[in-house]
Design a protein with these regions (language model features):
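An N-terminal, well-structured beta->alpha segment
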Residues: 21-63
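Glycine-rich phosphate/diphosphate-binding loop of Rossmann-like nucleotide-binding domains
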Residues: 74, 78-113, 117
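N-terminal amphipathic/basic leader segments beginning at the initiator methionine
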Residues: 1-29
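A structural signal for small-residue-enriched, beta-sheet-centric alpha/beta enzyme cores
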Residues: 118-119, 148-275
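Gly/Ser/Thr-rich loops at beta-strand to alpha-helix junctions
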Residues: 76-84, 124, 151-155
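Conserved active-site and cofactor/substrate-binding residues in soluble primary-metabolism enzymes
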Residues: 30, 46, 50, 54, ...
Length: 275
């Protein structure tokens, strides 16, 4: 793991290189990048320009297609629900160029990469599995790379709208809200897949878990080291604690997710940055 801490942002690279590491982390083997910045939530044009350049560098580090290779960008999510509309909003702001092939002067065409983009919607709108739509488009267009953009569910409340996560392992649409669909990855689509996501919601169990963490940290600080109570507090596993909270809250809150009240403006800013 490599972390670069700066005044306005932090950038973390995680490489999972072995099956043992994959099992321990609960993620497929691959390269994971997280760009965190509170400035993502704010209307700070100068900082956003810096973050756009940084984000572009990270995307290039995950895949290096040739200039003539076509890239397909997929905006996942339900455009009728603001926290889930990140993908479709990004697609609406992308400059698509695949249809311009052969119509531009040679000098300009050499500098323009063919890009196609689509928002396939969700199965509740189309009646079609998102993965089936994407697979059909890939089989027809034969792009060299797919970039999938999706809204995520945060596992830490301080990451809501403040982190852009990237990986070269693909994406499972709907997994964050317990509605896992067909995987969009190289094994299913036959081409490399870069996933880009932003946590825009958090579930009730995570909010309670984060609150308990703050309480436990304070209790540990005030408890004499070496006592049985101290050891009990220190030995609590994060994942076990989260699962216990989720099970307790389940009958009362159901599938409850929360998003900040300013989500409309923030999702628009995030879409501009990613696009």
């Amino acid at each position: 793991m490599e972390t670069d801490e700066q005044a306005d942002y932090s950038l973390t690279h995680v490489h999972i290189l072995s099956p043992a590491g994959s099992e321990r982390m609960g993620k497929p083997m691959g390269h994971y990048i997280t760009l965190e910045s509170e400035k993502l939530k704010e209307n700070d044009a100068d900082c956003h320009e810096k973050l756009i350049g940084l984000l572009a560098e990270q995307i290039r580090s995950l895949a290096k297609p040739k200039r003539e290779d076509c890239i397909l960008v997929i905006g996942l999510g339900n455009w009728n629900i603001t926290p889930d509309a990140l993908g479709p909003k990004v697609i609406s702001k992308i400059l698509v160029t695949r249809h311009l092939s052969g119509t531009l002067p040679v000098e300009i065409e050499k500098a323009v990469r063919p890009v196609a983009a689509v928002s396939p919607g969700v199965m509740g709108i189309t009646g079609i599995e998102t993965g089936e739509i994407v697979k059909g488009i890939v089989d027809k267009l034969h792009p060299s790379l797919l970039i999938a953009i999706d809204a995520l569910a945060a596992r830490r409340s301080n990451r809501i709208n403040a982190a852009i996560q990237m990986s070269d392992t693909g994406v499972a649409p709907g997994a964050g809200v317990g509605n896992r669909r067909m995987l969009l990855d190289e094994a299913h689509l036959g081409i490399p897949v870069i996933a880009i996501g932003v946590p825009t919601v958090v579930d009730a169990a995570t909010l309670v878990n984060d609150t308990m963490d703050c309480i436990l940290e304070e209790m540990i600080r005030q408890t004499e080291k070496g006592t049985a109570f101290y050891e009990t507090l220190a030995d609590l596993e994060q994942e076990e604690k989260y699962q216990m909270i989720a099970e307790i809250l389940g009958p009362y809150t159901g599938n409850l997710f929360v998003t900040p009240k300013e989500v409309d403006a923030v999702v628009d800013r995030l879409a501009n940055i990613i696009a």
